Amino acid sequence: AETHAKYGTTSMVPTTLTCSDTELMNMFATYRKAKVLNTKGAKFIGLHLEGPYFSPKQSGAQDPIYLKKPQPEEYNAILESSEDIIRWSVAPELEGAIKMGHVLQEHHILPSIAHTDAIYEEVTQAYKAGYTHITHLYSAMSSVTRRNAFRYAGVVEAAYLIDDMTVEIIADGIHLPKPLLQFVYKFKGADKIALCTDAMRGAGMPDGESILGSLANGQKVIIEDGVAKMPDRSAFAGSVATTNR
């Protein structure tokens, strides 16, 4: 938090990855302690949970071992374990995701769309259930797809066609090239766009190996070229950008 504050960040939302229940509970406890100890850094304003309810087809840097469908008894137990959650990213096409969206709304938590292979019709249904925001537009999500010879609009197209849908983009200049950033701005407008760093622990650190997720069971990544990459360099694994970038 102190490192990010040096680069202009005033508030931040610590974010989880898909992980075991034990690690998630440990994260909740760590966050509660950090809120008290953090007096000089960027202010913690709540937690963002990414997963584990994501599509295996769009797992990205998320550990596929932990991916699953939403089960009420499970996510309700998580909600009872922390009052700090302000946003939860989910793949809305999964069985049980629509019901979960309604539950999150009841808890005043923003349901968000991420790591998803949904088609347009599934996104519009999810929007009505409270999924009014898209996490990391273009990253690990469907665009125009073909199923049995027929083409279907995906999440990206739905983001533009649903006027009041807000979108978040990783604005590090690497995840999305400049023309694509301009495209998003042109068609959504500044009031429907949130810029984020998506910074992982490698932010402010020198190039080399790092860990995405927990130190005990997280995924090894490589920091180079101003971004975190999977070890085989086949995909990005988060950003190391700071707000000034």
Task: Label every model-predicted segment.
Residues 151-169, 173, 185-245:
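His/Asp/Glu-enriched, well-ordered alpha-helical/loop segment
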